[in-house]
A protein has these predicted regions:
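A short helix->loop->beta-strand "cap" motif at the edges of active sites that frequently abuts
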Residues: 94-99, 124
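Residue-level recognition of beta-strand->loop/alpha-helix junctions
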Residues: 39-43, 103, 128-130
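Catalytic His-Asp segment of secreted/periplasmic serine-dependent ester chemistry enzymes
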Residues: 106-175
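Extracellular glycan-modifying ectodomains
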Residues: 55-57, 74-82, 87-93, 106-113
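Structural beta-sheet core signal
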Residues: 69, 100-103
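Conserved SGNH/GDSL esterase-like catalytic core that processes O-acyl groups on lipids
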Residues: 2-82
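Solvent-exposed, polar/charged alpha-helical surfaces in well-ordered, non-transmembrane soluble domains
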Residues: 22, 26, 83-86, 90, ...
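Cofactor-binding loop segments of dinucleotide-utilizing enzymes, especially the Rossmann-like FAD-
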Residues: 1, 104
Length: 175
């Protein structure tokens, strides 16, 4: 199925520098000039919660100061998600000095409860995000222009993209 996404950064950000990870890196560099953010798309883990975490992200997680777990929207199996998110949290804690976890952008009580439980039982900072989508108009619209990986503009024509946060929404997630 063609989902009309021609980029490798946060879906619905108009350009790479406006996705959540790149905006976060820019903010961190104001206070710690050599900060780097390494975005990892682990949607494959969200869709297959039993896949091997180490083979998916292990090489990227070694000796990090902080890992931010920002996922949940692609999780389909909410029955096994509570155990899976706890395993992911423990794995990340074994690799980084500090781990922070966010809730989902799209409100889903079941997923949110699992994330909150994992945060509380592992003494993590939890940052809710669903309020952004509920309170602000931070989704792109049909007809808005985005850019592909070659910086070529294209116009949004499908509804799938407009369920994701736009540049402003990405900024709010980063903050």
């Amino acid at each position: 199925e063609d989902i009309e996404w021609f980029s490798d950064w946060g879906m619905a950000a108009s350009n790479i520098e406006y996705d959540y990870c790149h905006q976060l890196e820019k903010m961190l560099c104001k206070y710690h000039p050599n900060s780097t953010v390494t975005p990892l798309n682990i949607a494959s883990w969200e869709r297959n919660l039993s896949c091997d975490i180490d083979s998916l992200i292990g090489s990227y997680c070694k000796n990090k100061d902080i890992i931010i777990i920002r996922l949940g929207e692609n999780v389909q199996d909410v029955t096994t998600f509570p155990d899976a998110i706890s395993r992911l949290v423990k794995y990340c804690q074994s690799k980084a000095k500090r781990v922070i976890i966010t809730g989902c952008f799209w409100k889903n009580d079941s997923k949110e409860r699992s994330i909150i439980h994992a945060a509380r039982t592992n003494d993590l900072t939890y940052v809710p995000l669903y309020w952004i989508d509920n309170l602000y108009n931070v989704r792109p619209q049909i007809g808005d222009t985005l850019y592909d990986i070659n910086k070529k503009p294209y116009v949004i024509t499908q509804d799938f993209i407009i369920t994701h946060p736009n540049d402003e929404g990405m900024q709010m997630i980063a903050e």
